[in-house]
Amino acid sequence: MAVIANRYEPLELAPAGAAVKARDMQTAQTVMLRPITRVDERLRALFHPSLVTIFDIVHDGAATFAACEFVQGRSLRLIMGGQPCNGRRAAEIVAEIANAVAELHSRGIYHGAITIDTVLLTAKGKAKLDLVHATDSAESTDLDQLRVLLKDLTGYERPDLADAGSAAVLAARLRSQ
């Protein structure tokens, strides 16, 4: 397999245009190389425990890739398999992601694509927000998406969970000010 951008050695075969697990030959770190069309440069090297870190953005021929933290985990959609999540666990996940969103907002960055597809759960159960899908949006969009995430996790709206979601959203808003 050909080295990408003279730095990343693919560790597995992947279809053209798909993400590929690779080894950074400079650091010996395992990363995910994700093909991208655009990414906000401010996301590079933004470190937070609930954000998937983008270490580098590289060009290889006509293709552009984000070299991202390799996360041993899967998206919430895959984990849930169409079944709702326990209410307490749903609130914990939303609180973790709200904390990450607060970090983004404190830097003037808005994600705009917070869904069960862009939130990953690690093998240890930690929620991480994928930054590759971030779009240029507004604070209110992110906060609304946190509420929808809570609803999607539980399968329906419950007043007690709406309160937990509101608390997480409020915490995110306060932390970003």
Predicted regions and their residues:
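AlphaC helix of the eukaryotic protein kinase fold
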Residues: P35-A45
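Flexible N-lobe loop architecture of eukaryotic-like protein kinase catalytic domains
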Residues: F47-S50
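Activation-segment/catalytic-loop signature of the eukaryotic protein kinase fold
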Residues: I57
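Conserved short submotifs of the Hanks-type protein kinase catalytic core
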Residues: G61-S75
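AlphaC helix of the protein kinase catalytic domain
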Residues: L76-C85
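Activation segment signature within eukaryotic-like protein kinase domains
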Residues: I93-V94
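Protein kinase catalytic-loop region centered on the HRD/HxD motif
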Residues: N99-I109
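C-lobe/activation-segment region of protein kinase-like
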Residues: K128-A167
